[in-house]
Amino acid sequence: MPVLKQLGPAQPKKRPDRGALSISAPLGDFRHTLHVGRGGDAFGDTSFLSRHGGGPPPEPRAPPAGAPRSPPPPAVPQSAAPSPADPLLSFHLDLGPSMLDAVLGVMDAARPEAAAAKPDAEPRPGTQPPQARCRPNADLELNDVIGL
């Protein structure tokens, strides 16, 4: 198996040093008061989170021992549709008008008899609707239409 050699300069480029003029001075419009670590742990001033509704919900307290128990709230039914936030569960391919027109044009070119006779909205009783056929030696190739 051949060994691939990386092409490039023999000497690696040296990164330029950052000078005092390349970093701007603090503008005074930002205060660093909070830090979030890699594990999600946060420390510092988190009071702004409570003003924006981003705080965690309060933990439920255990009722006193002598208090009667109330029935649990009804469960919220979950929809069977995938969440739009999960791109792996939904797949949507938009070819756009130009790509779709090109593909449909190639398919129509493969059926010259279909261009002459447009099918009715409903087929007549006792007749079969026309079947789509593709010829292997069509005049237009899909790669030519889309520019490959």
UniProtKB/Swiss-Prot annotation:
Residues recorded with modification Omega-N-methylarginine: 38
PROSITE patterns membership: CRIB
GO BP, sorted A to Z: JNK cascade; positive regulation of actin filament polymerization; positive regulation of pseudopodium assembly; regulation of cell shape; Rho protein signal transduction
Domain CRIB: 23-37
Compositionally biased tracts (Pro residues): 55-76
Record flagged with keyword ATP-binding: no
Pfam family, one: PBD
Signal peptide region: none
Keyword terms, alphabetized: Cell shape, Cytoplasm, Cytoskeleton, Membrane, Methylation
GO cellular component, one term: cytoskeleton
Keyword Cytoplasm listed: yes
Coiled coil regions, renumbered to chain: none
Residue stretches of biased makeup (Low complexity): 77-87
Chain's role: Probably involved in the organization of the actin cytoskeleton. May act downstream of CDC42 to induce actin filament assembly leading to cell shape changes. Induces pseudopodia formation in fibroblasts. Inhibits MAPK8 independently of CDC42 binding. Controls septin organization and this effect is negatively regulated by CDC42.
Assembly: Interacts with CDC42, in a GTP-dependent manner, and with SEPT7.
Domain observations: The CRIB domain mediates interaction with CDC42.
Protein name from the UniProt record: Cdc42 effector protein 5
